[in-house]
Structures are given as C-alpha cells and as structure tokens.
Amino acid sequence: MERVQPWLAPFTWAMVTAQNAMLCAAKNALHKPTSDGHAVTEDLWENRHHESMSLDEAVDLCRCCHRMAPFCLYNGNTFSSIIALVIRKLDLPPTEGQIVRSLAGHIVAGVASDEEERAFREFCASLS
C-alpha cells in the first residue's frame, strides 16, 4: 500500500454533506450549514480532498474541517466516519483495524492523548 495517495478523493463535498445529513437524521437532529464555517470548510475540502497525501495528513485535514464547524451538529462524527471508511479500505486484521479507526477518530475529534497520536503516527509511518 502506498503511503502517499489520494485517500480522501472519493469523498466530494456533496458526500460529506450527505454523511452529516444521515447522522443528523438518525438522531432527529437539525442538519443545517453554519453561516461562519460552511463556505470556508467547503472551499478547503474541495481544494484539498483529491490531493495525494499521507494518511496522517488526511486525518489532519478531517480534524481541521471538524474544527471549522461547517454544520450545526455532528461535525466530529461526520469527519471521523469519513476517515474510518478510508481506514476500512486498508483491509487490516479486525482488531488492528478497530484500533487504528479508533485512534484516527480520536485525533479527528480532538480528544486523542499524546500517546494515541504517537501510536497513530507510528502506524502511518509503517505503511509502505
């Protein structure tokens, strides 16, 4: 598996928006763009998501977009679920896959400890 590739290329902004809408619908929550963060986040995503980057850079882009709060609710869940789908494509053994998805999700949500961040970065460095 190539360490640098367009990990997020399949996820257009329309797909990001649909993912947020599904997460909101599942909880009967308001799905609506924010006035401050939506347009700038969409621009960032559309300019970067198709680029080749390392997996940890893809996680960082998702974290950045989460922090920009493009939607009223479930920003963290939206971008965490996207990176989880990317990691599922790595076809890792089940336990390792769950650990890597959990680490990435914590990083995107901004709740990862230094140890979790270090473990994830080491995993990313191990990709050939």
Regions from the language model: what does each represent?
Residues 1-128:
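FIC/Doc superfamily catalytic core
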